[in-house]
Amino acid sequence: MEALFLRVGWISLTCSAVLVPLLVGKGWLRRHVRAKALYVVWLILALRLVVQVDLSLPEPAVTVEAPSYQVALPARTPSANLPAGAQIEEPSAVVGQTAPEAASAVRTIPVTALLSALWLFGVLAAALVQGGGYLLARRRLLRDARPDLEAEAQAGQTAASLGLKRAVPVRRSRQVRTPMVLGLIRPVLLLPEGQAVDEVVLYHELTHLKRLDLAYKALLVAACWLHWFNPLVWWMSRAASENLELCCDDDVAAGRDAAFRRKYGELLLSTA
């Protein structure tokens, strides 16, 4: 556990050196760098934060061997003044050895062990709060949701045009105000009650599924759990999620006519 904690801390520290300029200059990057390029940058950083692989060299390039020292204690000869049969107590040959009584009287716990336990507690707490909150929200949103067969048929046509092989169930819910896709393994498209089915809405939400954006967000969440102590990682997660929406918008509008682009732009403005 201590080795894992130290590796996580080292990865968090090294990634922070890259995150600081990226996050501070986020506005400049958004204006001068394509969203898809930033998508790759955030993905690489998230993978590095989550995948705990030691990238150090198997053998250091330069090794310096510390010199070894031996301490020889002079032998003590029996004194003529000592009575016959008396034994002379020889000093311990191990330099720095402590008495067993002193070692058992004081029990020390390494600082790394305490920090490792604190880190593990934070990981479990973050997973419990966020993961449990997600499960409760999913249950609440789906509890009163009802199927919409007409919208599901339209979503099936849109999914086929996007190349999705699996149909996505569509539900109506009074608990949502904007359309959303819920679920990573078994996704469900939730639409607000009473809202008309819009083609651009279906394209936007189903494009998220085609791009595997839910898995991308799950990776960001895992990075936040492992590095809960690093505010830069949480900041990175928000920045990457915002950039993810821009990438999705670019894919939806790519190759569309002016009417579709105008309608999609109006949708983005209405939901901003």
Residue ranges and their predicted role:
Residues 196, 200-213, 220, 248-249:
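Active-site recognition of the HExxH zinc-binding catalytic motif
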Residues 211-241:
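A Zn2+-metalloprotease active-site environment signal
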Residues 175-199:
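Active-site scaffold of zinc-dependent metalloenzymes
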Residues 132-178:
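Auxiliary, metal-adjacent structural segments of Zn-dependent hydrolase domains
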